[in-house]
Amino acid sequence: MASVMIFRGVVIHSLDLETLEFIDNATLVITNGHITGFWKTVEDVPEDAFPPNSKIHNLSYGEFLIPGFVDTHNHAPQWPMRGLGQGLHILDWLNKVTFPVEARFSDPIYAKRMYEDTVQDFLRQGITTASYYGSRHAEATRILADICHARGQRAFVGKCNMDRNAPDYICEESAAISLQETKECIVHIRGLEPKDELVKPVVTPRFAICCTDELLRGLGDMVQADDTLTMQTHFNEAQQEIDATTELFPGFKGSEADLYESYGLLNRRSILAHCTIMSDYEKERLEALKCGIAHCPIANMTVGGGFMVAPIRDFLRRGIKVGLGTDSGGGWASSMLAVIRQAMIASNAREVLSEGKDKALSLEEAFYLSTLGGANVLCLEKQIGNFEVGKEFDATWVTTTTVYNQL
């Protein structure tokens, strides 16, 4: 028997980058988790739109529905250290703050306790979809996937790969072990029951600095062999990181686009975090390869060494997919609302720096990036991101008032 839910009231969602639709008295029909009816006025609803005795939710004053937020870049093991190390250069921040925290996830009991709180916190913030970096520990990564699955959060979960240029206590023993554990995590995630496909694996090289040639090549082979497998990494995050990458890979002359492409890691399912310092050539390559960008404005303006404002307007002008990321850890907030605010502030700064060429983001555009734009980056735009009929009902029910306030 079909399960039917009806929502009546205020609905807000993006139709495209520039169009944010506010509907005062919408009717949404959800059948077995999918949107099967959407009308903008009560008068438009057919008499036979839903079966009798359907469960109807009439939204009260101060309540509305929005699509669930999509977090395109999130370090789950860094959730306990949000806000620490602000102002440090990126490689110093990793060594002094991040690696010691992530090393604790070698303990599965600790990992389970932290990840339960982490996932619950992001769900409480309305983040119904997240692309998670795990730690380098396979067991902890499986635990994270299990928790996302149990809590009903749509997630991409990846075991972080790092077999060099990290302290011994966190560095993986070899590329072979890293690759084998990654394959085992992929099998585990794809075998979660019941099979609702909410949780998916993602190949996760930390960045080229921490990966040997053998490891990058092996991960690229996985991505090339499976056209459903997503890849995420950091890309042109900060000048210190770019300089270190160029020193390790001099043959690519500073182009991370050429570097990652040479290993088979760039395609339409690639999620590239940050992208703050970009040449026109690299923008052209990402556009041609249809990669997605995870814009992390909070982290980019507080960690890494410098005032790093990604050229989001130029990305959008070129048709490059862009979503927002909390970058939990580097980003001090779990809230996508905070990320939206910071994205708008950063874009205002970018407009000044570009002498008006790169116009600041509007509220409509920032909201799009946090929902439908993020869905595009994760190649989920046909499933979630707005309330189009046929999509899955992935939403946040927002209440802005209390009983006291309504009296």
Language-model-derived ranges and their functions:
Residues 139, 143-276, 281-283:
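Metal-coordinating catalytic core of metallo-dependent amide/deamination hydrolases
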Residues 80-113, 164-175, 238-269, 292, ...:
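Active-site gating loops and adjacent loop-to-helix segments of metal-dependent hydrolytic enzymes
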